[in-house]
Amino acid sequence: MSLMSSSMVLCHCLSFSSQNPDPESSSSSLLRYKPCDSISLWGKRRKKLWRFVPSAEKNNSHTGNNNKRRRSWWQRFFFDDDGNWLGLRDDDIVDETTELAKDDEMSDEEKFETWKRRAEAIVELREGQEEIGDSGVVADVTKKWEDWIVDSDDSFVESWTRDSAGSDDNLELDELTIPDGGLVKMVRDMVLGAEEEDILYEDRIFRYASSKSAKFLAVLILIPWALDFLAHDYLLMPFLDRYVKTVPLAAQTLDVRRNQKLEMVKELNREKARYRLEVEIGKSPPLSDDDLWWEMRGKALELRDEWRLENRKAFANIWSDMVFGISLFVLLYANQGRVALLKFTGYKIINNISDTGKAFLIILITDIFLGYHSESGWETLLEIIMEHYGLEVEQSTITIFICLVPVIMDACVKLWLFKFLPRLSPRVSNIFQEMKRH
């Protein structure tokens, strides 16, 4: 059985070429040996049994790639017989070049999806090992070594491997298995770097996601802001200046409003009081009524022009902010992969925060926007928004808005805290239950 299997494997590695376009090399290449990377010899000291085992290829076997990558320099120094201690083999160089070429062909989204699937698989494997415990170590190692040994492309070698393995597999697995707990595991991880590979890989994923997310976030901020600035200052404002001069209806629409006139009156009264104070303290010469009237008239015209300019800017803000929103929507819609990457980064950042930190952030945000002292903050925010767009709203409307919207938001947040948060993070929910708000 062993001899028949060996002959089949050797025939599998030899390739006969009957046609050769080169006449000079046709005689020498009639029987040509094809290098077979999937054949390795393993020996047993106990039973003196030598057998051929097909190894998994790099691109098809994740476990084989990990085992090769985990071989440290001193293992190659003591156990490799070819003298190539740094691992610079021709096949490895060719394979690495092929992998680099494939990585260059893949887009950033495809690379991220591949790395994300591998990271999720690593996390699921760790969780499964923690749930199974020491009883599942042999089964896990058996599955890894079966995936590395068995070649699904060669049915003959696969059947021979299953028949010839027999009961010796358990002995080999017992020899290859290393205990997971205590000092032995720590020393093994330090020497072999078994867990360091996964940690470095996860760090590389998070570093890649963080850099890409930071760049995309900068694009989301800079490009819409630049378009907003260009549309406001170089398109809309010059157009409105000419349009107001030629169209009387537009000039009337963007003229000084009632509340602005009241502000102008207050400013003129303060200016008149300032002139009188300077005359009384001797800082300015006394002015006649006509001179004071001309001074107040010039100040009133200056204030009128300023308020008209503010009205045109507020009207231009509406359209420029629409440009900002449309450009932001286009960027988000055209970059779904980067949006998913940004969500992944945000999820990882939030997930890395401790439960106490999460509870602190929730308390801070809710108290700022929904606390008993947040009424003045909401009022100021609404006034800034109304002034930005040049809207004239009564104080009663702002009061009604503050009495309704923050209260509804507070009810929704409390419902989420007491109903859905215990499912997502029980420890954070326990912190909230221990707190007594007065």
From Swiss-Prot:
Q: Which domain of life is it from?
A: Eukaryota
Record's bilayer topology term: Multi-pass membrane protein
Q: Does the keyword tRNA-binding apply?
A: no
Q: Where in the cell is it found?
A: Plastid, Chloroplast envelope; Plastid, Chloroplast membrane
Gene Ontology molecular function, alphabetical: potassium:proton antiporter activity
Q: Which GO terms describe its cellular component?
A: chloroplast envelope; chloroplast membrane
Task: Provide the alphabetized UniProt keywords.
Answer: Antiport, Chloroplast, Hydrogen ion transport, Ion transport, Membrane, Plastid, Potassium, Potassium transport, Transit peptide, Transmembrane, Transmembrane helix, Transport
Catalysed reactions, semicolon-separated: K(+)(in) + H(+)(out) = K(+)(out) + H(+)(in); Ca(2+)(in) + H(+)(out) = Ca(2+)(out) + H(+)(in)
Consequence of gene loss (knockout)? Pale-green phenotype in developing leaves with reduced chloroplast size, specifically under continuous light but not in the dark or in short-day, and associated with non-photochemical quenching (NPQ). The double mutant missing DLDG1 and FLAP1 (dldg1 flap1) has a pale-green phenotype similar to the dldlg1 simple mutant in continuous light, but a lighter pale-green aspect in fluctuating light and higher NPQ than in flap1 single mutant under short-day condition.
Query: Where is it mainly found?
Result: plastid
Example GO BP: regulation of intracellular pH
Transit peptide extent on chain = 1-54
Record keywords: Ion transport included?
Answer: yes
Q: Which residues cross the membrane?
A: 216-236, 314-334, 359-379, 398-418
For this chain, the annotated S-S bridges are none
InterPro entries associated with the record = CemA
Task: State its role.
Answer: Promotes K(+)/H(+) antiport activity supporting K(+) efflux to control H(+) homeostasis in chloroplasts. Also able to ensure Ca(2+)/H(+) antiport activity in vitro. Essential for chloroplast pH regulation and optimization of non-photochemical quenching (NPQ), a regulatory mechanism that dissipates excess light energy; acts downstream of PSBS but independently from PGR5 and FLAP1.
What is the similarity comment for this entry? Belongs to the CemA family.
What is the name attached to this protein's record?
A: Protein DAY-LENGTH-DEPENDENT DELAYED-GREENING 1, chloroplastic
The species this protein belongs to is Arabidopsis thaliana (Mouse-ear cress)
